[in-house]
Swiss-Prot record:
This is Hemoglobin subunit alpha. The modification Phosphoserine is found at S4, S50, S103, S125, S132, S139. The keyword Metal-binding applies. Heme b binds at H88. GO terms for molecular function: haptoglobin binding; heme binding; iron ion binding; organic acid binding; oxygen binding; oxygen carrier activity; peroxidase activity. Belongs to the globin family. One of its GO terms (cellular component) is blood microparticle. PROSITE patterns: GLOBIN (PS01033). GO terms for biological process: hydrogen peroxide catabolic process. The modification Phosphothreonine is found at T9, T109, T135, T138. The modification N6-acetyllysine is found at K17. O2 binds at H59. Involved in oxygen transport from the lung to the various peripheral tissues.
Length: 142
Protein backbone atom coordinates (compact mmCIF):
# COMPACT_ATOMS: atom_id res chain seq x y z
CA UNK A 1 0.00 0.00 0.00
CA UNK A 2 1.43 3.35 -1.00
CA UNK A 3 1.48 6.06 1.61
CA UNK A 4 0.65 9.52 0.30
CA UNK A 5 2.53 12.61 1.43
CA UNK A 6 -0.40 13.41 3.74
CA UNK A 7 -0.27 9.88 5.18
CA UNK A 8 3.44 10.20 5.88
CA UNK A 9 2.90 13.54 7.58
CA UNK A 10 0.07 12.11 9.69
CA UNK A 11 2.09 9.04 10.69
CA UNK A 12 5.14 11.08 11.67
CA UNK A 13 3.02 13.55 13.63
CA UNK A 14 1.14 10.81 15.46
CA UNK A 15 4.30 8.88 16.23
CA UNK A 16 5.97 12.01 17.56
CA UNK A 17 3.15 12.14 20.14
CA UNK A 18 3.93 8.54 21.11
CA UNK A 19 7.40 9.72 22.03
CA UNK A 20 9.10 7.57 24.64
CA UNK A 21 5.97 5.47 25.16
CA UNK A 22 6.44 3.24 22.10
CA UNK A 23 7.49 0.26 24.20
CA UNK A 24 4.63 0.73 26.66
CA UNK A 25 2.11 1.03 23.84
CA UNK A 26 3.63 -2.00 22.13
CA UNK A 27 3.25 -4.04 25.32
CA UNK A 28 -0.32 -2.85 25.79
CA UNK A 29 -1.16 -3.77 22.20
CA UNK A 30 0.33 -7.24 22.73
CA UNK A 31 -1.78 -7.69 25.87
CA UNK A 32 -4.88 -6.63 23.92
CA UNK A 33 -4.00 -9.11 21.19
CA UNK A 34 -3.47 -11.97 23.64
CA UNK A 35 -6.81 -11.22 25.33
CA UNK A 36 -8.83 -10.59 22.17
CA UNK A 37 -7.21 -13.25 20.00
CA UNK A 38 -6.05 -16.02 22.36
CA UNK A 39 -4.67 -18.19 19.54
CA UNK A 40 -1.84 -15.67 19.18
CA UNK A 41 -0.48 -16.89 22.51
CA UNK A 42 0.81 -20.04 20.78
CA UNK A 43 3.81 -18.10 19.47
CA UNK A 44 4.86 -17.21 23.01
CA UNK A 45 4.72 -20.51 24.95
CA UNK A 46 7.78 -19.58 27.00
CA UNK A 47 6.41 -16.16 28.03
CA UNK A 48 4.63 -15.15 31.19
CA UNK A 49 1.63 -13.54 29.48
CA UNK A 50 0.11 -12.05 32.60
CA UNK A 51 -0.64 -8.34 32.76
CA UNK A 52 2.53 -6.30 33.16
CA UNK A 53 4.93 -9.22 32.79
CA UNK A 54 8.55 -8.36 32.10
CA UNK A 55 8.57 -10.57 29.00
CA UNK A 56 5.55 -8.87 27.44
CA UNK A 57 7.05 -5.48 28.26
CA UNK A 58 10.35 -6.49 26.64
CA UNK A 59 8.63 -7.74 23.51
CA UNK A 60 6.45 -4.63 23.47
CA UNK A 61 9.64 -2.58 23.43
CA UNK A 62 10.83 -4.57 20.41
CA UNK A 63 7.53 -3.87 18.65
CA UNK A 64 7.73 -0.18 19.54
CA UNK A 65 11.35 0.06 18.42
CA UNK A 66 10.54 -1.63 15.11
CA UNK A 67 7.68 0.77 14.46
CA UNK A 68 9.85 3.74 15.37
CA UNK A 69 12.42 2.45 12.87
CA UNK A 70 9.69 2.08 10.25
CA UNK A 71 8.39 5.60 10.85
CA UNK A 72 11.92 6.86 10.26
CA UNK A 73 12.11 4.99 6.94
CA UNK A 74 8.68 5.49 5.40
CA UNK A 75 10.23 5.69 1.94
CA UNK A 76 12.10 2.38 2.34
CA UNK A 77 10.12 0.08 4.60
CA UNK A 78 11.40 -3.09 2.86
CA UNK A 79 15.01 -2.09 3.45
CA UNK A 80 14.43 -0.98 7.03
CA UNK A 81 12.47 -4.08 8.02
CA UNK A 82 14.30 -6.72 5.98
CA UNK A 83 15.89 -8.43 8.99
CA UNK A 84 12.58 -8.55 10.85
CA UNK A 85 10.89 -9.97 7.78
CA UNK A 86 13.51 -12.73 7.58
CA UNK A 87 13.17 -13.47 11.30
CA UNK A 88 9.38 -13.75 11.28
CA UNK A 89 9.19 -15.70 8.01
CA UNK A 90 12.06 -18.15 8.34
CA UNK A 91 12.83 -18.59 12.02
CA UNK A 92 9.66 -17.75 13.95
CA UNK A 93 7.22 -18.75 11.19
CA UNK A 94 4.51 -16.45 12.43
CA UNK A 95 1.19 -16.81 10.62
CA UNK A 96 0.81 -13.59 8.58
CA UNK A 97 -2.72 -12.98 9.87
CA UNK A 98 -1.23 -12.20 13.28
CA UNK A 99 0.33 -9.00 11.96
CA UNK A 100 -3.15 -7.76 11.07
CA UNK A 101 -4.41 -8.66 14.52
CA UNK A 102 -1.55 -6.82 16.21
CA UNK A 103 -2.10 -3.84 13.91
CA UNK A 104 -5.73 -3.70 15.00
CA UNK A 105 -4.67 -3.78 18.65
CA UNK A 106 -2.05 -1.09 18.04
CA UNK A 107 -4.68 1.17 16.50
CA UNK A 108 -6.94 0.62 19.52
CA UNK A 109 -4.08 1.39 21.89
CA UNK A 110 -3.15 4.57 20.03
CA UNK A 111 -6.80 5.68 19.97
CA UNK A 112 -7.03 5.28 23.75
CA UNK A 113 -3.81 7.17 24.47
CA UNK A 114 -4.04 9.86 21.80
CA UNK A 115 -7.77 10.67 21.71
CA UNK A 116 -7.39 14.29 20.63
CA UNK A 117 -4.92 13.44 17.89
CA UNK A 118 -6.60 10.28 16.61
CA UNK A 119 -8.73 11.94 13.94
CA UNK A 120 -10.32 9.95 11.12
CA UNK A 121 -7.53 11.07 8.78
CA UNK A 122 -4.81 10.05 11.24
CA UNK A 123 -6.59 6.75 11.88
CA UNK A 124 -6.68 6.04 8.13
CA UNK A 125 -3.01 6.98 7.71
CA UNK A 126 -1.89 4.83 10.65
CA UNK A 127 -3.98 1.95 9.34
CA UNK A 128 -2.30 2.24 5.93
CA UNK A 129 1.11 2.48 7.59
CA UNK A 130 0.55 -0.62 9.73
CA UNK A 131 -0.82 -2.46 6.71
CA UNK A 132 2.34 -1.54 4.80
CA UNK A 133 4.51 -2.75 7.67
CA UNK A 134 2.54 -6.02 7.77
CA UNK A 135 2.97 -6.46 4.02
CA UNK A 136 6.73 -5.98 4.32
CA UNK A 137 6.97 -8.38 7.26
CA UNK A 138 5.15 -11.08 5.27
CA UNK A 139 6.95 -10.42 1.98
CA UNK A 140 9.56 -13.13 2.53
CA UNK A 141 6.97 -15.84 3.15
CA UNK A 142 6.61 -16.29 -0.58
Amino acid sequence: MVLSAADKTNVKAAWSKVGGHAGEFGAEALERMFLGFPTTKTYFPHFDLSHGSAQVKAHGKKVGDALTLAVGHLDDLPGALSNLSDLHAHKLRVDPVNFKLLSHCLLSTLAVHLPNDFTPAVHASLDKFLSSVSTVLTSKYR
